[in-house]
């Protein structure tokens, strides 16, 4: 009987699992410990050594699963690993005569457990999709061996801890989806220097300022919604104009004016900065966002006049600007397919704030420089309120309350997050060259 114990991987594993990984509402008290190596029965014959390594990785992973309600891994035995449910095989990139495991897709399996270090033996995989399960713990260091990994989807699980920086070193990674987990702390600046195409971090517990180098990222889709980010919208994001198509920053604690460089995002089709604490006017430069289709700035403390150029954008069809302190809107806004103008300070218009509330708020000027975001982070200052980050409370939870001085709205579910679906399951990644 062969014992597989490669030197690059540590097989001793101690992982604290949560009872909630098995049933909702439990407390963390289940300790899973394993220090025995994976053994390969002598009667198993493998087509090549890479498939043998894949067998070890998958058997270790199966051991790390404590619940598989749909029995997806019941056929995970024997040497024919390419026949395992959720396992994709193809020709090796460096040798077309060698078959290897090129992807794993266990999406929507409701499997509970953790990811073992041995998964680092799957050195040929391009796709790793495990969304909508109950995996917990952290991303193992062994993932640093996955030099061909192109798509990593860990969304809708119970992973926790700091941002898994092991992904920063994956040279081929283009698609990273960590949404709907329990990751926390700060985002590393190096994340935005990485050559990603899509980045989904929404609905976690990240709490920090957004790194100032966010604009270095070449992503086409960036979703940071429903976390606890605070401070400024980094002015550097104007540099993303050539690549960015969708940006979702809603439901955080951002406090600043909107940078004038917003107008440089001329390829953006969806922009959502609702449910924050943004102040000042909408920059007139936003009238240059010629591809904009959906714009949501609801539930902030914005004021002044809505630029004529904005509602005249040819492709704009959905503009939500309710629950702010705007004092004027062009008539063209009311001709859009979808719009929301309520709870502002428009005169002689129904469903607005009271005159007293508007007067109190608008009597204090906004000083965009007080936020000290950086040069270029100015906005056109109307007469609205002087609100500094130190005096204005941060949104304490993923669903911020309405701004101060306003009548609190009735309780409502968290707002939707515009984001495209994950990549098609079992799809082959683009060229790894």
UniProtKB/Swiss-Prot annotation:
Protein name listed in UniProt: Leucine-rich repeat extensin-like protein 7
UniProt superkingdom: Eukaryota
GO terms for biological process, alphabetical: cell wall organization
Pfam families, A to Z: LRR_1, LRR_8
Regions of compositional bias (Pro residues) in chain numbering: 395-427
GO cellular component: extracellular region
Subcellular location: Secreted, Cell wall
Region (Disordered), start-end ranges: 380-433
Sequence segments annotated as region (Contains the Ser-Pro(4) repeats): 381-433
A Gene Ontology molecular function term of the record: structural constituent of cell wall
Signal peptide interval: 1-21
Functional note: Modulates cell morphogenesis by regulating cell wall formation and assembly, and/or growth polarization.
Keywords for the protein's UniProt record, in alphabetical order: Cell wall, Cell wall biogenesis/degradation, Glycoprotein, Hydroxylation, Leucine-rich repeat, Repeat, Secreted, Signal
Tissues expressed in: Expressed in flowers and pollen.
PANTHER family named in the record: LEUCINE-RICH REPEAT EXTENSIN-LIKE PROTEIN 3-RELATED, LEUCINE-RICH REPEAT EXTENSIN-LIKE PROTEIN 7
Chief location bin: secreted
Organism, as annotated: Arabidopsis thaliana
LRR repeat extents: 98-122, 123-145, 146-170, 171-194, 196-217, 219-239, 241-265, 266-289, 290-313
InterPro entries, per database record: Leu-rich_rpt, LRR_dom_sf, LRR_extensin-like_regulator
Sites carrying sugar chains: 71, 267, 340
PTM characteristics: Hydroxylated on proline residues in the S-P-P-P-P repeat.
SUPFAM superfamilies given in the database record: L domain-like
């Amino acid at each position: 009987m062969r014992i597989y114990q490669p030197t690059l991987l540590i097989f001793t594993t101690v992982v604290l699992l949560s009872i909630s990984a098995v049933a909702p509402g439990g407390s963390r008290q289940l300790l899973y410990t394993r220090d025995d190596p994976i053994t390969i029965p002598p009667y198993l014959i493998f087509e090549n050594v890479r498939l043998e390594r894949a067998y070890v990785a998958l058997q270790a992973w199966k051991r790390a699963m404590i619940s598989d309600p749909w029995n997806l891994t019941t056929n995970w035995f024997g040497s024919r690993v390419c026949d395992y449910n959720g396992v994709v095989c193809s020709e090796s990139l460096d040798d077309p005569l060698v078959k290897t495991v090129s992807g794993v897709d266990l999406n929507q399996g409701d499997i509970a457990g953790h990811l073992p270090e041995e998964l680092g033996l799957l050195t040929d995989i391009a796709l790793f999709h495990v969304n909508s399960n109950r995996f917990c713990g952290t991303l193992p260091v062994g993932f640093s061996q996955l030099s061909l990994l192109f798509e990593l989807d860990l969304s809708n699980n119970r992973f926790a801890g700091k941002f898994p920086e092991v992904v920063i070193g994956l040279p081929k990674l283009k698609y990273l989806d960590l949404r709907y987990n329990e990751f926390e702390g700060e985002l590393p600046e190096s994340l935005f220097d990485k050559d990603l195409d899509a980045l989904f971090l929404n609905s976690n517990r990240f709490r920090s300022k957004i790194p100032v180098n966010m604009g270095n990222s070449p992503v086409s889709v960036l979703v940071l919604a429903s976390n606890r980010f605070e401070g400024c919208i980094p002015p550097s994001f104007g540099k993303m104009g050539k690549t960015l198509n969708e940006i979702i920053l809603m439901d955080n604690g951002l406090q600043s004016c909107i940078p004038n460089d917003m107008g440089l995002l001329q390829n953006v089709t969806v922009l959502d900065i609702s449910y924050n604490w943004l102040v000042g006017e909408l920059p007139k430069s936003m009238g240059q966002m010629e591809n904009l289709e959906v714009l949501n700035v609801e539930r902030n403390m914005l004021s002044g006049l809505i630029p004529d150029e904005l509602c005249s954008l040819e492709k704009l069809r959905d503009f939500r600007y309710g629950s702010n302190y705007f004092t004027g809107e062009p008539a063209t806004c009311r001709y859009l397919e979808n719009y929301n103008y309520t709870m502002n300070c428009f005169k002689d218009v129904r469903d607005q704030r009271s005159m007293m509330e508007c007067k109190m708020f608008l009597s204090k000027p906004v000083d965009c420089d007080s936020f000290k975001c950086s040069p270029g982070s100015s906005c056109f200052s109307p007469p609205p309120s002087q609100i500094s980050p130190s005096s204005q409370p941060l949104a304490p939870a993923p669903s911020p309350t309405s701004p101060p001085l306003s009548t609190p709205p009735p309780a409502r579910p968290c707002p939707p997050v515009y984001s495209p679906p994950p990549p098609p399951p079992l799809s082959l990644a683009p060229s790894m060259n």
